[in-house]
Amino acid sequence: MKDCFPQGLNGKKTAVALSGGLDSVVLLHLLVRAGKKGGFIPDALHIHHGLSPRADDWADFCQNYCDMLGVGLETVKVCVEKNGLGIEAAARQKRYAAFAEKGFDVLALAHHRDDQIETFMLAVARGGGLRALAAMPAVRPFGEKGIIWRPLLPFSRQDIWDYAQKHGLPNIEDESNTDTAYLRNRFRHRILPELSAQIPHFGRHVLNNVRALQEDLALLDEVVVQDCRWVCGAGYFDTARWLTFSPRRKTHILRHFLKENGIPVPNQNALADIARVLTEAKTGRWNLQGFELHHYAGRLFVFRLEKTDKLRFLKDRQISGNLREILTGQGFVLKRHPFGLPEHLLEQDGILRTVAASDTLAMGGIHKDVKKILQGKRVLPVLRPIWPLVADSGNRPLALANCCADFQYSVSDGILPVHPDFPILF
């Protein structure tokens, strides 16, 4: 198993997903032994789904087992709701969401070789695409900075059982594992044994296919990453660059862009609709499970809905007082700028508010409408009415946040208020 270790576990926050079943019990035991030699100590994480009448007993078993091994255990209770999914898929979704919230650097899962074969066959039966058919990678990114690690993939269910017997390891059996109403169990107990009996080395053939598909997928991902890097090379998603690709590559680039921004990738039809609008229309807007996607001025913008709501902190109100105090109090950073406001202005009373239709700023000898300045900077129409503006006590505009100061008041190496949740326009 040493050959399966990811680089540099020392100092990493490592946890084993412990169900109490044979596989995870063996994995935790192995990692505790390896950790004593390698200088790292794994923790354990148990997800209490509440689906079995024995769920509390399983949690108690996991606690006792971890006490025996001398490792820490955290038990997390989740409420599983189907929401249009099967019970297995819904439980898996909740489980992985709980894993992600904990922010481990390395999360070790106990999937083994037989699980890999079952996963491939399930993807075949359900019509999965390349990513589904490639089954489970040994290591993959997870959460913001972590990885999921499956060190038991080279080993069979029998290998794991033999190890448990050799070391006298206890475990619990989930009664649902024998219920052939679940498709995975039908494959495990009926279909795969029959295929293995009829086709010599059937499991080996499946695993060879999985390895080949994983290599193809890795190559495809490399190409997509390079494509997306070029499309976003100017610091934003450039629709004109995206349009130079073939339809297939455009779809993959779009999917990768959404995934990289933390957006749940929609189904194929929804993805095709986004691609169609980007190709045919000048503007577009989509709500995607807690996110807003905006197409405007040849660019694609992503906003988290909760963040968009926060941007409305000045809507229908204005804040008066010492400018430095009210700006820092509202989360602004006072950054140095070649043509910013003088320090003494920030010590005076003023007003923080959103832009108004009549607002103008002196720019290079002429006065420009603030809203036209924002339009020229390709600011989304939805953001323009809530964009912050700094005015003096007489309500005359001094500076447009994140953008520029009025030339009549600006000095070299002055100060420009910048709010981190709004785009930077300079």
Curated annotation (Swiss-Prot):
Keywords linked to the UniProt accession: ATP-binding, Cytoplasm, Ligase, Nucleotide-binding, tRNA processing
Entry-linked InterPro entries: Lysidine-tRNA-synth_C (IPR012796), Rossmann-like_a/b/a_fold (IPR014729), TilS/TtcA_N (IPR011063), tRNA_Ile_lys_synt (IPR012094), tRNA_Ile_lys_synt_N (IPR012795), tRNA_Ile_lys_synt_subst-bd (IPR015262)
Signal sequence, renumbered to the chain: none
GO biological process per UniProt: tRNA modification
Reaction catalysis annotation: cytidine(34) in tRNA(Ile2) + L-lysine + ATP = lysidine(34) in tRNA(Ile2) + AMP + diphosphate + H(+)
Known EC number: 6.3.4.19
A single cellular component GO annotation: cytoplasm
Gene Ontology molecular function: any one: ATP binding
Any single Pfam family the record assigns to this protein: TilS
Function: Ligates lysine onto the cytidine present at position 34 of the AUA codon-specific tRNA(Ile) that contains the anticodon CAU, in an ATP-dependent manner. Cytidine is converted to lysidine, thus changing the amino acid specificity of the tRNA from methionine to isoleucine.
Family: Belongs to the tRNA(Ile)-lysidine synthase family.
Stored HAMAP family: tRNA_Ile_lys_synt (MF_01161)
Entries under PANTHER family matching the protein: TRNA(ILE)-LYSIDINE SYNTHASE-RELATED (PTHR43033:SF1)
Name assigned to this protein: tRNA(Ile)-lysidine synthase
Organism: Neisseria meningitidis serogroup B (strain ATCC BAA-335 / MC58)
Lineage start: Bacteria, Pseudomonadati, Pseudomonadota, Betaproteobacteria, Neisseriales
